[in-house]
């Protein structure tokens, strides 16, 4: 057996019906498009969301919300990520050096997710209440 001799099992691949090839094919003449109308024409059909001229749903409903541009430069730091930083002092630069946050991040907040076992000094980051308690319980400090 070679790769060039492989073929699917007999009868496993059925050829698709060809349109416009006689009345006996079941898809002759109009080819399954019906008679006349926009959808029977070549290039016919309507865009997504078009409702025949009626005001479409996406325009009937009101606009809402926005995307804060600050969210693109803000990151959440898990407690478990603090152990990945070398030296025991955690700030924006050491987090970037450890590839925990991207270089475009300007603000970060430490949240209570995971565990911290080694004492660390958190400098210049915002810290949630639960994360603050966990860091101090592990013997760490928080410097504003």
UniProtKB/Swiss-Prot annotation:
Gene Ontology process terms (BP): translation
Gly residues composition-biased segments: 21-31
Region (Disordered): 1-54
Keyword 4Fe-4S assigned: no
Keywords linked to the UniProt accession: Ribonucleoprotein, Ribosomal protein, RNA-binding, rRNA-binding
GO molecular function, one term: structural constituent of ribosome
Pfam families referenced in this protein's UniProt entry, alphabetically: Ribosomal_L27A
Top-level taxonomic group: Bacteria
Keyword Transmembrane helix part of the UniProt annotation: no
UniProt GO cellular component terms: cytosolic large ribosomal subunit
Disulfide bonds: none
Subunit details: Part of the 50S ribosomal subunit.
Xref: PANTHER family: 50S RIBOSOMAL PROTEIN L15 (PTHR12934), LARGE RIBOSOMAL SUBUNIT PROTEIN UL15M (PTHR12934:SF11)
Role played: Binds to the 23S rRNA.
Name the UniProt record assigns to this protein: Large ribosomal subunit protein uL15
Naturally occurring in which organism (per UniProt): Enterobacter sp. (strain 638)
Lineage, opening ranks: Bacteria, Pseudomonadati, Pseudomonadota, Gammaproteobacteria, Enterobacterales
Gene that this sequence comes from: rplO
């Amino acid at each position: 057996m070679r790769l060039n001799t492989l073929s699917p099992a007999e009868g496993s691949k059925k050829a698709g019906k060809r349109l416009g090839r006689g009345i006996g094919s079941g898809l002759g003449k109009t080819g399954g498009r019906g008679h006349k109308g926009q959808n029977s024409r070549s290039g016919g059909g309507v865009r997504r969301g078009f409702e025949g001229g009626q005001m479409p749903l996406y325009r009937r409903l009101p606009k809402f919300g926005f995307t804060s541009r600050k969210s693109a430069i803000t990151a959440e730091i898990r407690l478990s990520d603090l152990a990945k930083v070398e030296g025991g002092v955690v700030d924006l630069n050491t987090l970037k050096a450890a590839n925990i946050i991207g270089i475009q991040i300007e603000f970060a907040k430490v949240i209570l997710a995971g565990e911290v076992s080694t004492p660390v000094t958190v400098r210049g980051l915002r810290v949630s209440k639960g994360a603050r308690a966990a860091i101090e319980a592990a013997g760490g400090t928080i410097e504003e």
